[in-house]
Every structure is written in C-alpha cells, then in structure tokens.
C-alpha cells in the first residue's frame, strides 16, 4: 500500500458521529480501526515503519491517556522499546511530575512517573487525535521536565481547523499524522 492509499484506507474506517458530545461537533471515532484486525495491523504498521528508521527510532514511546495507550504500547512493543503512560491526575501510584493545561472551559492536569524516562531519552509521544494540541503540549512539557527530548508527536487524526497541529509545530515539535480531516 502506498502512503496515500494507507491514509485513504484508514480514513474509510474512521466513523464520524454527528452532534457528539455536543450539537455541531463532528466526532471522529477511531474505534472501528481497532475492531478489525486487518485494519488495526495497517494502522500500527504505518507508525512502526516510520519509526523503524534509525534516525527516527525512539528510545521510549509515551502514550497520552487513554487512546494513546492503545497505540503507544503496541508501537513500543513492535519497536522493542519501553512504553510509558501519561495519565490524568491522580491515576499513578508512585512519585509523579505534573503539568496543567488550559481547556476551552477550565483546565486539566496530566502526570508521569518521575522515573519514567531518563535524561537524554528520545521519546515518541503518541495519541489518537490532535484537536487543540493542549494534551500533547502538556505531555511534551512533562517529558522535557525529566530531561527527555520529544523527537516527534504522532497521531492517527489531525483536525487542523482547531489549530492544535499548527501550535505544536510552532512550538518546535515535529508531527506525524495519518489522516487529516480539514474542511470536513
């Protein structure tokens, strides 16, 4: 499959749920990508093939709560590197570092175990979707607090009209996404 056909193939398996969780929202549901083993393999392989390259190979994969865990753990396994979860506040049992970020109405906090990465580790930060970019930016800051370098952010879906991918790139974070839903 070519890169273009992989993107189109994956797009065909992303369900759009209108007016969820609120009127006017077009929710991009990735669960159909996970339900079919052939489609799931194509999805995971799209990430693994990119990061097998020596220049892009991470030391660690970090996944953002919660769908980033699904992708990140499998990609880390396939690359034979460690996986670390970045969780919502209060979900990790050991000493943590935390980062608070702004939401449209309020704020949220994510945490990482203080020993999850080592200074100098090259980290791939992965999630299912980039909307406003707040969660991924908070994850990047957490990893950098511990001395790691976030070499790239990755996601299945980019919603560029919400500005997150532009903000992340402007912060210096390279991004790799598989399906762009601009103008949809």
UniProtKB/Swiss-Prot annotation:
Pathway: Purine metabolism; AMP biosynthesis via salvage pathway; AMP from adenine: step 1/1. The keyword Ribosomal protein does not apply. Its EC number is 2.4.2.7. The keyword Ubl conjugation does not apply. This is Adenine phosphoribosyltransferase. It is found in: Cytoplasm. One of its GO terms (cellular component) is cytoplasm. Keywords: Cytoplasm, Glycosyltransferase, Purine salvage, Transferase. PANTHER family: ADENINE PHOSPHORIBOSYLTRANSFERASE. The gene is apt. One of its GO terms (molecular function) is adenine phosphoribosyltransferase activity. Catalyzes a salvage reaction resulting in the formation of AMP, that is energically less costly than de novo synthesis. GO terms for biological process: adenine salvage; AMP salvage; purine ribonucleoside salvage. NCBIfam families: apt, PRK02304.1-3, PRK02304.1-5. InterPro entries: Ade_phspho_trans, PRibTrfase_dom, PRTase-like, UPRTase/APRTase. Belongs to the purine/pyrimidine phosphoribosyltransferase family. Homodimer. It catalyses: AMP + diphosphate = 5-phospho-alpha-D-ribose 1-diphosphate + adenine.
